[in-house]
Amino acid sequence: MDKALNIGKTKVTTKIKKESKEADKITKLQLMSTDKYRATVLQPIINEIARIIDYGQPCVADGTYGKMNGGHYVSVGANRTTALNLHNIHIQSFSSNHFKSGDSIRYKAGLIERYGKDYFEFVEFLQQHKPLNLTKQDLVNITLKASTIRLNLKRDEKTKTAFERIELRNIINLELGIYEQKFCEFYKE
């Protein structure tokens, strides 16, 4: 009888701890600034989407395989507005992204080699977008969409052609609804 009582108490204690942890997480999210929410909740999901799109590809900057990040051509510190645009985020090795300050010269060369000069110029053009001024609720809504997109992409993770990778970036940028259409879609004329 005592053993059954102890098991019951343990289950109740575990449930209370779990509920408390969930409440703490919700409170922490509520107290986050809008930019902190973008950086810690939404940005990792967007970066993972870019990595899934580029699945099977080597680092855009140094051509290596291994531990990968979603690296930004235009750094987030330099321009927050382009931080969530998938055309600005490509698979990049951890080493190139972190220890070589983004490796921007080789990143540029890699974009041109993979997708062409017109695409690179489009990525540069993204910097002309006006500031986003998204609210935290906007970011929460975008996070929900991005999470669903990420899950669907994971179900069909395979190597894609350069054209398919650009098309996916076009489609997903539009689905997320963050940017004006001309900043979402690249089409070679």
Region spans (language model):
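A boundary/linker detector
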Residues: 1-45, 131-189
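Cys/His/Pro-rich metal-binding microdomains
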Residues: 1, 60, 94
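Short Cys/His-centered divalent metal-binding micro-motifs
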Residues: 66, 88-119
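Catalytic cores of secreted/periplasmic lytic hydrolases that degrade extracellular macromolecules
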Residues: 123
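Non-catalytic accessory segments of DNA primases and related replication-initiation nucleases
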Residues: 101-105, 126-128, 133
